């Protein structure tokens, strides 16, 4: 049984979508690490830092379908992080004795931080897409309820009357602000 609510079969869907959970799953996280290792090798090959064929050979096998997950889990618990055990497996998978060039010149933190950024980028795309839908729904609510009275609230008590449409417009303004900022961040 999971000790985390986000991994719970009962509660998990209440706190996140399957799409978002997939981005941060173990399998996808390892794939991000492999993607970074492959990209690093391709660039280093192109620059002549490692043999020219290494980038392609490492990229060919940078997939999670061959990973020995039990070994990765066991070695990670010993080492304290998954990069060394992953690179050990990756270097054995690369043909033509080119495995020695896996992870060339990189640190564990380089790989993990870069993969984290890629995960966050992909998660941000989902959030922005969701916010577009929320904005559309809020715009409809603003128009529909612009003249529907309700009690205003301040300091956890009733205040001057307002409209539900106006209340929705304040939520909408927040969404507009955040989507603008998030879209700007996405392309920086």
Predicted regions and their residues:
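Single conserved hydrophobic/aromatic residue that forms the stacking wall/gate
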Residues: 178-188
């Amino acid at each position: 049984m999971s000790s985390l609510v986000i991994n719970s079969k009962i509660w998990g869907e209440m706190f996140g979508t399957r799409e978002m959970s997939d981005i941060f799953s173990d399998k996808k996280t390892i794939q991000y690490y492999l993607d970074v290792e492959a990209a690093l090798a391709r660039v280093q090959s192109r620059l002549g830092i490692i043999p020219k064929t290494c980038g392609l050979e490492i990229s060919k096998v940078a997939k999670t379908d061959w990973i020995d997950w039990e070994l990765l889990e066991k070695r990670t618990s010993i080492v304290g992080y998954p990069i060394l055990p992953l690179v050990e497996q990756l270097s054995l998978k690369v043909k033509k004795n080119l495995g020695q060039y896996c992870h060339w010149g990189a640190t564990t933190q380089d790989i993990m931080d870069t993969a984290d950024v890629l995960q966050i980028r992909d998660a941000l795309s989902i959030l922005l897409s969701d916010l577009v839908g929320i904005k559309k729904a809020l715009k409809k609510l603003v128009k529909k309820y612009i003249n529907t009275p309700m009690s205003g609230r301040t300091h956890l008590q009733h205040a001057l009357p307002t409209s539900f449409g106006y209340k929705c417009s304040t939520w909408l303004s927040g969404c507009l602000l955040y989507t603008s900022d998030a879209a700007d961040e996405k392309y920086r």
